[in-house]
């Protein structure tokens, strides 16, 4: 084990990284309420793992989407557990995110010099809600279909460009295969990629500036 460690140490100086992480100052006022951000991240990682597992069996077509979900729940080994964990962690992620936002706001974590940290956090909150909106429709059952129809119809109220926005979201004038394809692509590719980018920025700024002090 020592030779293995020494090999990496000689090339990457990993001990410096470990020392930097372990030596980071943690303010004495930090308590359990400061864990909500980390719990949100944990839920996100569960989402990534379980979501990735389901992509092997889910079929993003209007004809097969619902039956593929049934197949996951009834035929795939531990499929019911994987999908249930995905749903439960999604709800928990939203709850932890809300509590995290309240904690940051009440302790003044958005104030100078942490404005950019707050902005990236707000963007991550929007992305989290977007995950919920797109994922809710993927089973393509009655609830998912009508939720998709209502959500994509909201921009219609925007003056001038409303109809164009709706058509872009739906992939046409009505809700159908193009809409499901767009939601699936957003849910599994675009939103996760953006989330990882803004999470890295969020954590790097926290690492640089540290945790905000007490009120």
Swiss-Prot record:
Reported cofactor(s): heme b; heme c
Matches recorded under PROSITE patterns: CYTB_NTER (PS51002)
Binding site for heme b 1: 100, 202
Pfam families for this protein: Cytochrome_B
Residues bound to heme c: 35
Major localisation: plastid
Residues engaged in binding heme b 2: 86, 187
Keyword flag Cell inner membrane: no
Transmembrane segments: 32-52, 90-110, 116-136, 186-206
Topology with respect to the bilayer: Multi-pass membrane protein
Keywords (A to Z) from UniProt: Chloroplast, Electron transport, Heme, Iron, Membrane, Metal-binding, Photosynthesis, Plastid, Thylakoid, Transmembrane, Transmembrane helix, Transport
A cellular component annotation (GO) from this entry: chloroplast thylakoid membrane
A single GO molecular function term of this UniProt record: oxidoreductase activity
InterPro entries recorded: Cyt_b/b6_N, Cyt_B6_PetB, Cytb/b6-like_sf, Cytochrome_b_N_euk/bac, Di-haem_cyt_TM
Cofactor: binding details: Binds 2 heme b groups non-covalently with two histidine residues as axial ligands.
Further comment: Heme 1 (or BH or b566) is high-potential and absorbs at about 566 nm, and heme 2 (or BL or b562) is low-potential and absorbs at about 562 nm.
HAMAP family, per the entry: Cytb6_f_cytb6
Family per record: Belongs to the cytochrome b family. PetB subfamily.
Entry function: Component of the cytochrome b6-f complex, which mediates electron transfer between photosystem II (PSII) and photosystem I (PSI), cyclic electron flow around PSI, and state transitions.
Protein name, entry field: Cytochrome b6
Source organism of the structure: Cyanidium caldarium
Organismal lineage: Eukaryota, Rhodophyta, Bangiophyceae, Cyanidiales, Cyanidiaceae
């Amino acid at each position: 084990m020592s030779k293995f460690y020494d090999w990496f140490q000689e090339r990457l100086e990993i001990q410096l990284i470990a020392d930097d992480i372990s030596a980071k100052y943690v303010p004495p006022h930090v308590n359990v309420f400061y864990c909500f951000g980390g719990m949100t991240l944990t839920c996100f990682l569960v989402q990534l793992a379980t979501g990735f597992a389901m992509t092997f069996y889910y079929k993003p077509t209007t004809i097969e989407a619902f039956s593929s979900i049934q197949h996951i729940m009834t035929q795939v080994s531990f499929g019911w557990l994987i999908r249930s964990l995905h749903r439960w962690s999604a709800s928990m992620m939203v709850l932890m995110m809300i509590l995290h936002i309240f904690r940051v706001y009440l302790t003044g974590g958005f104030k100078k010099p942490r404005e950019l940290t707050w902005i990236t956090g707000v963007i991550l909150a929007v992305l989290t809600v977007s995950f919920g909106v797109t994922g809710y429709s993927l089973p393509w059952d009655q609830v998912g279909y009508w939720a998709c129809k209502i959500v994509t119809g909201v921009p219609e109220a925007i003056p001038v460009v409303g109809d164009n926005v709706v058509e872009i979201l739906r992939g046409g004038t009505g809700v159908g295969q193009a809409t499901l394809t767009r939601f699936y692509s957003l849910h599994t590719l675009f939103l996760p990629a953006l989330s990882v980018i803004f999470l890295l920025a969020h954590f790097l700024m926290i690492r640089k500036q540290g945790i905000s002090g007490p009120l």
